[in-house]
Amino acid sequence: KIGKGKKVTDYGLGILQLPSVPKENRQIYQEFAVRLIGRAVFCWFLKMKKSDVDAPLLPENLLSSKAVKQHTGYYHNILERLFFQTLNTPIEQRVENLPEGAEQIPFLNGGLFEPGIQDYYKPNKETGLSENLNTLKVGDQWFMSFFEELEKYNFTIDENSVTDIEVSVDPEMLGRIFENLLAEIDPDSGETARKATGSFYTP
């Protein structure tokens, strides 16, 4: 859940629509949502890390509630390109027309951002955008609500002590977030859920 009483996915309101997947197939929708949330939260921590020239590894203009306001069709125009064309692609192999700021983002080879079949990612060679623009939909308002919730917390790359007064989210808590998300899919077998979603956490 995102905040008290807020659902990760709402099939009735069409917040998430997947290509050729009936709404009744809740597991496929849940697995997609878990991957999306896991990747987004991981990226939120990247914003806290700095490069050798003291620049954020991931700029605010690509991942924030303000970024959602500035980019209509946020999932396809920004997040897909951030996940699959930037974080999953070595710098020397990236296309030229990536969103501004992508040039400072490192390549991560851990597999978290490698697109799978159920990511429904089919990039157009000319535009770089997915060919599923009209059949895979994640509402901008959902990202607004999600990011506004994340912005209430202090994300830190250092694990906090029990004496910290400020409410912080550290790598240890990130691990718990992943575990809880996986339990949404399969409460009895976290390992099975990890394999199904391709979600692995490394602190």
Label each region the model flagged.
Residues 1-203:
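Preference for the N-terminal adenyl/adenosyl cofactor-binding alpha/beta module
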